[in-house]
């Protein structure tokens, strides 16, 4: 029976390997664009008495080919001097027939007319003042459209960041996504139109949307037909704790190892640091042969051959059932139920990750050959996992792999179970009566500490990162291995 299962496993490897090239082509890095945040750059422009476009042009030789415009709030226009903002009580005391519990705006007439149509709220004009019954200072209020046009005419890749707000109107006449935009990067923690107006909002977005690494945005999957571009950014507070070299290495790693196409940057307080950051990114991208340019939406059609990997996974599950001397079939059946119930459509990939690292330990424990056998099974499991995990959702980053914690816990438990023989009660009794030694306790404690560290480090934002791990990551990165 074992020979038959091994034969099936080997036969399943061939179509599974043939199913991988489409995924490799779809995940090929580049082209990428360096996007500077327009509002973060504005302080530098104002301090030098220059326009935003002039400062952008000064960064073009350093690889910057794009600019992102976050949508402004009403209070941003007030702070810039384009609008005046007064409560109704103030206007009433000034002799105007305003409503005391309303709020009023005055200033740029073109902008006021846009705001009049922007919100699903009652409004009124009191002379030159536009009034609303709610305090609209934190309401979305479009973009500096002249700067958007100028950046586009200068050849920059333009991204806009609309804000989702329950009172905003999604009207085609409003510049929610200006026609100059090349991509949309939703601001905040949810996509435009979420939760009840996604269908209407999709009509306002004619360009690809960005998937921000590490920032789930409910409703984003509804825009899949528009095209998905993967974006990497560092939270600015965290960026300030990093040197330009450290930050640049993270951007290069994101483009090289995770296929990010939009690198979203905010300048450091000192221009010298920003220039150093950009130079380092350019050098890293060139060394990795990743071109700068206009990012394109990745198209991926899974190969039907990937389904053959299920034969390999089921064969591996059968080998596990036969290899465990205690409750082997029961354990294999429970793993199958766990994978189907927890991971759903990703059950095959999860089973490959849980089962194949263990198979090498189920045969004869003959030193080096056991480890070589274990390596072979693990590589086969990697092929099956990659084949079954090759779906458009995973390639685009819309669906994360389910079961990372299980892959850290279950294989060691299965290996421990493999050491029990059929007379497991006698083995457990002997283990219970075994006299403890200080060295054994120390080794067990070290093993538990390492397991705990692995669990803590499984996510993208872990609570602790030892210095030794950072040094190891840096070394692996220099050797072109993803840490």
PLM region descriptions:
Residues 17-29, 456-464:
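Hydrophobic alpha-helical transmembrane segments in integral membrane proteins
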Residues 24-302:
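Soluble extramembrane regions of membrane proteins in the secretory/endomembrane system
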Residues 2-11, 307-483:
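Alpha-helical transmembrane segments of integral membrane proteins
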